[in-house]
Swiss-Prot record:
<keyword id="KW-0067">ATP-binding</keyword>
<protein>
    <recommendedName>
        <fullName>T-complex protein 1 subunit gamma</fullName>
    </recommendedName>
</protein>
<dbReference type="GO" id="GO:0140662">
    <property type="term" value="F:ATP-dependent protein folding chaperone"/>
</dbReference>
<keyword id="KW-0547">Nucleotide-binding</keyword>
<dbReference type="GO" id="GO:0005524">
    <property type="term" value="F:ATP binding"/>
</dbReference>
<dbReference type="GO" id="GO:0005832">
    <property type="term" value="C:chaperonin-containing T-complex"/>
</dbReference>
<keyword id="KW-0963">Cytoplasm</keyword>
<comment type="function">
    <text>Molecular chaperone; assists the folding of proteins upon ATP hydrolysis. Known to play a role, in vitro, in the folding of actin and tubulin.</text>
</comment>
<dbReference type="InterPro" id="IPR002423">
    <property type="entry name" value="Cpn60/GroEL/TCP-1"/>
</dbReference>
<dbReference type="InterPro" id="IPR027413">
    <property type="entry name" value="GROEL-like_equatorial_sf"/>
</dbReference>
<dbReference type="InterPro" id="IPR017998">
    <property type="entry name" value="Chaperone_TCP-1"/>
</dbReference>
<dbReference type="InterPro" id="IPR027410">
    <property type="entry name" value="TCP-1-like_intermed_sf"/>
</dbReference>
<dbReference type="InterPro" id="IPR053374">
    <property type="entry name" value="TCP-1_chaperonin"/>
</dbReference>
<keyword id="KW-0143">Chaperone</keyword>
<comment type="similarity">
    <text>Belongs to the TCP-1 chaperonin family.</text>
</comment>
<dbReference type="GO" id="GO:0051082">
    <property type="term" value="F:unfolded protein binding"/>
</dbReference>
<dbReference type="GO" id="GO:0045335">
    <property type="term" value="C:phagocytic vesicle"/>
</dbReference>
Length: 530
């Protein structure tokens, strides 16, 4: 009579509450243990063999986690956490995973004691709100017009990276690029689109010291005809996203030719069409024509006769950047071209040969709101690592320009938060007190790992640092761990700072993700379809 009802597929793997929670704790700790040694100036490098067989050597937390293959959903969630942090603020990818794992581990004891996750989560959320207000209280404003000071901050943020030797050069490149693409709106809003308008071009060869910011656009393109000019000063630029060749039908077109005259007429129509679109361009007397589509031999012939240089098959993003630096408007139909569509903001167009390839340079722009960062290096591996570190420097510079506030680095702000929250936990009553205090203690993981990674005596160092912060919290909040030699130093004197936006985002992301994990009480893995 009573047949059993199977709600889930019988092949699906299921974990009940206790198994699921234990699995999550273990998975999260495992991910954090992989990148724990990648924190601080004495960070170790990881060598990873990716699925394509390429070896990646890096200490960038996000780059490492992106390459490793994990099966547990909680571990995947931690990797996603690092990626989200990287996309949002571009820094603190290692710290956020370590902190999330530590916060989650601090709740394990309460789960074992059968305290409901609801109480733990509420305590964590209270601690997060208090942490954010304390970080605001301890933040210091920075003057963006003081370039040496801004450079020092950017350098302190990427000093842990592989390219520490060329840190000064990378910071200058990053700051120049960010200031170039920075747009201040009339209503006070700022826009810095690094991804779209600060293009990184990597060319193997030369030395890292040859890297520079081109206040304009650089393309891996050559002119379409050997007789075209290869250098033009103050060029008049036309940008097109239409083809400069005869337009063929969208579908298969059949033409019935009965005699020779019909064929000649067909060729003549093609020639007249190409000539007409070329005349639309020529009448505006441009020096340079860029198009996203093809250019026919006949069109090249007309351009060469009039001394016009033409480049074809540009990417949409490249065309947008040229429009941004030159003031030109991208036009879809040649018969709609007007004088106002011509770009005159570029000072120099030149084709240069680097190695075996030809590159187009558009430089000396009046008001470039886009730039190209040219990276040189001995090998592709070095170039890839330099690019990863430059991306971090660009993100730090962008964060400072958008939110010019700093907090002390070297684990100082985490220790100050830990001290302040521990004190505040004494005034909290009920079941919330213990998880609140546990979160406060878990924040000490950052100075602890910094000390471990440089080979210092962790127990002694942390005890001294705790005592320093406890004696005078309002003045000693800038004391942290010097990651180079494992001593307690005033970060203000050492000039080690973190950006306010990164620190706030790290705390929010780490604690919120820990709260999300705590709410999981069941894991059901569906059977894969064979």
């Amino acid at each position: 009579m009573n047949q059993p009802v199977f709600v889930l597929n019988t092949n699906a793997k299921r974990e009940n509450q206790k198994e699921a929670q234990q699995g999550i704790f273990l998975a999260v700790k495992s991910v954090a243990s992989i990148i724990k040694t990648c924190l601080g100036p004495k960070a170790m490098l990881k060598m990873i063999l990716d699925p394509m067989g390429t070896t990646v050597v890096t200490n960038d937390g996000n780059a490492i986690l992106r390459e490793i293959d994990v099966t547990h959903p909680a571990a995947k969630s931690m990797i996603e956490l690092s990626r989200a942090q990287d996309e949002n603020v571009g820094d603190g990818t290692t710290s956020v995973v370590i902190l999330a794992a530590e916060v989650l581990a601090s709740s394990e004891l309460f789960i074992e004691k059968k305290i409901h996750p609801h109480y733990i989560i509420k305590a964590f959320r209270m601690a997060l709100d208090d942490s954010l207000s304390i970080v605001d209280q301890y933040s210091v404003a920075i003057d963006l017009k003081n370039r040496p000071e801004v450079l020092k901050v950017v350098q302190s943020c990427i000093g842990t990276k592989f390219i520490g030797k060329w840190g000064s050069l990378m910071c200058n490149l990053a700051l120049d690029a960010v200031m170039t693409v920075h747009i201040q709106e009339e209503d006070g809003r700022s826009e810095i689109d690094i991804k779209r308008y600060a293009k990184v071009e990597k060319i193997p060869g030369g030395d890292i010291s040859d890297c520079r910011v081109i206040r304009g656009v650089m393309l891996n393109k050559d002119v379409t005809h050997p007789k075209m000019k290869r250098m033009i000063k103050n060029p008049r630029i036309v940008l097109l996203d239409c083809s400069l060749e005869y337009k063929k039908g969208e579908s298969d077109t059949m033409v019935d030719i009965t005699n020779e005259d019909d064929f000649s007429a067909l060729l003549k129509i093609e020639e007249e069409y190409v000539q007409r679109i070329c005349e639309d361009i020529i009448k505006l007397k441009p020096d340079l024509v860029f198009t996203e589509k093809g250019v026919s031999d006949l069109a090249q012939h007309f351009f060469v006769k009039k001394g016009i240089t033409c480049l074809r098959r540009l990417k949409k993003s490249e065309n947008n950047r040229i429009a941004r630096i030159s003031g030109a408007t991208i036009v879809s139909r040649t018969d709609e071209l007007q004088e106002s569509d011509i770009g005159t903001g570029c000072g120099l167009f030149e084709i240069r040969k680097i190695g075996d390839e030809y590159f187009t340079f558009l430089e000396d722009c009046k008001e470039p709101k886009a730039c190209t960062i040219l990276l040189r290096g001995a090998s592709k591996d070095i170039l890839n690592e330099v690019e990863r570190n430059l991306t971090d420097a660009l993100n730090v510079a962008r964060n400072i320009v958008l939110d010019p506030r700093l907090v002390p680095g070297g684990g100082a702000i985490e220790m100050a938060l830990s001290q302040a929250l521990s004190e505040k936990s004494k005034s909290i009553e009920g079941l919330h007190q213990l998880p609140y205090k546990a979160l406060a203690q878990s924040l000490e993981c950052i100075p602890k790992i910094l000390a471990q990674n440089c080979g210092a005596n962790t127990v002694k160092l942390l005890t001294e640092l705790r005592a320093k912060h406890a004696t005078n919290p309002t003045e000693n909040y800038t004391y942290g761990v010097d990651g180079d030699n494992g001593t307690i130093v005033d970060m203000k004197q050492l000039g080690i700072w973190d950006t306010h936006s990164v620190k706030v985002q790290t705390l929010k992301t780490a604690i919120e993700s820990a709260c999300t994990m705590l709410r999981v009480d069941h894991i059901a893995s569906a059977a894969s379809k064979q």
